[in-house]
């Protein structure tokens, strides 16, 4: 039993296996007690939520252990990279709430990497191979059978040096030759079988222009860049587990070149791998996401149906909700398929705390309060956010003519229908209790107007408002509202596990992933909200104004519903 003065004991969150490894390194005094991580995106596309998991780890452990996390753009393939991607990646990381130490580029080290490659040739660790890509691949062998040595494997060092320099000239022919590390063609690890470390590319680089015609491969540039920068922990996803011995081997060579063989195991980056993020109904391949954009299946990288950070931001996800979701699923050594519903639940929980409550009617039908004075209006006070008193209130105009949701009225209803029906009372939120008296139909039998009478002493805050009425409806004044377009999104794909389906991805697209609803009505306060402001359309879901929205043409994106309707739909 605790006394009044005692503080409750906070439940200590268990460490991830990555944090355990880092704490063990700190306890041993490795790297002088420093913690330095990096997030190394390739600037060939927009970041998606899978990258967000890596970002949360890289920046999170650096912050937790008083270290630093830098950004390094892996810009070793100029055919796919540009500055647009660089700028958007930086914007996404900043939006997620992280601050980097420095910004680096693999291209910063092209001179050092070239020097290292020359050293490897001179010391018999690399050679120029003039075979075709198909021949090289065929000679690699299989995991159970050794590879076959290239006929160029033992070519004279001076010849390889001369050809390597030739690779880096405008006259060289792409695909005519590559530089390969001379390692072990019989190694069970396929990555060790004389990997290609340089290839010819004549596309101008977005930073270095036409200075280079030969570029390092990822495996050759990545570990060395970590080493040049002083990275202590190189954290990546599980597909890089078989790359780790090669990562370490190249750093061994680099330390040997620098004469650091006495302390070859000290002051070097340690590669640690965790499980990547996989989500149901979600494509994570940047190559395929780019194809969706280029082929017009989506409006762009920031289409709200895309799993990109920019798409989620535009849809109305908060950075906190994404971070909370990633924190909830954790980091393991085993790949798993996470339910999209878990992400949406995290979004829903977070937006409940921060979204401003407003009224909007998506499928409107006219409600006339027949005994309300013609031409009279009242300003009703509406709480902006019951979860946060500091958000204050706003006013919503009440009048004789209102819009309500068509589904909130039934001419003949069962006893379990607690919304509007003839002869029954309902409460209009923030306003009065009204009793439905009838409805008007057109020649086709469609209801075009509902009539009701209000109780003048039942206004919110009055004594008459306290009587029990089961149904509460939202509404907007027909004369004090704005017309809007609402975009409702569904899963982009119809299959939960895309990786398990052999069909082409475009065959799996959901033709109903976007539903556009025109002629909706929103209250004036909602019409004034801008992109970036989180809204709850009461009784409907969470929304945000789209960048397409203008004063003359309001557009709102549905972020997520108030409840998980997808689970019910698929039962």
What residue ranges belong to the model's regions?
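N-terminal acidic, proline/glycine-rich, low-complexity intrinsically disordered segments
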Residues: 1-7
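N-terminal catalytic cores of NTP/NDP-binding nucleotidyl/phosphoryl-transfer enzymes
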Residues: 13-90, 205-237
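Residue-level signal for inorganic ion chemistry
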Residues: 29, 58, 89, 120, ...
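Conserved short loop/turn motifs at secondary-structure junctions
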Residues: 40-43, 72-80, 102-111, 134, ...
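Active-site cores that bind ATP or allylic diphosphates and position pyrophosphate for catalysis
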Residues: 71, 75-77, 83-84, 105, ...
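A glycine-rich helix N-cap at a beta->alpha junction
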Residues: 85-111, 116-119, 124-127
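Long, charged, mostly alpha-helical binding arms that flank functional sites
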Residues: 266-346
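Substrate/cofactor-recognition hotspot
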Residues: 325-571
């Amino acid at each position: 039993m605790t006394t009044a003065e005692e503080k409750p004991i906070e439940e200590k969150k268990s460490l991830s296996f990555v944090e355990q490894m880092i704490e063990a390194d700190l306890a041993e005094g490795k790297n002088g007690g420093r913690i330095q991580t990096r997030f190394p995106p390739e600037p060939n596309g927009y970041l998606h939520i899978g990258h967000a998991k890596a970002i949360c780890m890289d920046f999170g452990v650096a912050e937790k252990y008083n270290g630093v996390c830098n950004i390094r753009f892996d810009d070793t393939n100029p055919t796919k990279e540009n500055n647009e991607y660089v700028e958007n990646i930086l914007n996404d990381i900043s939006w997620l709430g992280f601050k980097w130490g420095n910004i680096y580029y693999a291209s910063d080290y092209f001179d050092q990497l070239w020097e290292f490659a020359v050293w490897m040739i001179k010391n018999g660790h690399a050679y120029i191979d003039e075979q075709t890509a198909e021949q090289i691949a065929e000679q690699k062998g299989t995991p159970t059978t050794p590879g076959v040595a290239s006929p160029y494997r033992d070519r004279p060092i001076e010849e390889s040096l001369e050809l390597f320099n030739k690779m880096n000239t405008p006259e060289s022919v792409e695909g005519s030759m590559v530089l390969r590390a001379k390692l072990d063609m019989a190694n069970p690890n396929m990555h060790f079988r004389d990997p290609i470390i340089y290839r010819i590319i004549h596309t101008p680089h977005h930073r270095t222009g036409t200075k280079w015609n030969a570029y390092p491969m990822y495996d050759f540039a990545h570990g060395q860049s970590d080493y040049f920068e002083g990275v202590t922990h190189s954290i990546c996803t599980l597909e890089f587990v078989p790359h780790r011995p090669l990562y370490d081997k190249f750093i061994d060579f680099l330390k040997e070149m620098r004469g650091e063989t006495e302390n070859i195991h000290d002051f070097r980056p340690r590669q640690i791998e965790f499980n990547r993020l996989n989500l149901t109904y979600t494509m994570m391949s940047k190559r395929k996401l780019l194809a969706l954009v280029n082929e017009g299946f989506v409006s762009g990288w920031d289409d709200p149906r895309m799993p990109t950070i920019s798409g989620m931001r535009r849809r109305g996800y908060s950075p906190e909700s994404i971070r909370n979701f990633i924190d909830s699923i954790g980091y393991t050594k085993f790949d798993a398929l996470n339910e999209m519903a878990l992400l949406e639940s995290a979004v829903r929980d977070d937006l409940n705390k921060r979204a401003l409550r407003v009224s909007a009617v998506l499928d409107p039908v006219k409600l006339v309060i027949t005994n309300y004075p013609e031409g009279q209006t009242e300003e009703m006070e509406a709480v902006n956010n019951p979860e946060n008193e500091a958000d204050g209130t706003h006013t919503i105009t009440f009048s004789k003519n209102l819009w309500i949701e068509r589904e909130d009225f039934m001419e003949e209803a069962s006893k379990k229908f607690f919304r509007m029906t003839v002869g029954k009372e309902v409460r209009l939120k923030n306003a009065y209790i009204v009793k439905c008296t009838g409805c008007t139909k057109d020649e086709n039998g469609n209801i075009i107007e509902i009539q009701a009478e209000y109780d003048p002493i039942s206004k919110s805050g009055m004594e008459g408002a306290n009587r029990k009425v089961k149904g509460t409806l939202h509404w907007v004044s027909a004369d004090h509202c704005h017309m809007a377009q609402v975009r409702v999104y569904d899963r982009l794909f119809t299959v939960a596990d895309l990786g398990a389906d052999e069909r082409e991805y475009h065959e799996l697209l959901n033709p109903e992933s976007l539903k556009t609803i025109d002629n909706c009505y929103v209250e004036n306060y909602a019409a004034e909200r801008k992109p970036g402001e989180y809204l709850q359309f009461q009784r409907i879901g969470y929304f945000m104004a789209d960048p397409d929205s203008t004063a003359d043409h309001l557009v709102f994106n549905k972020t997520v519903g108030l409840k998980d309707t997808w689970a019910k739909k698929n039962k």
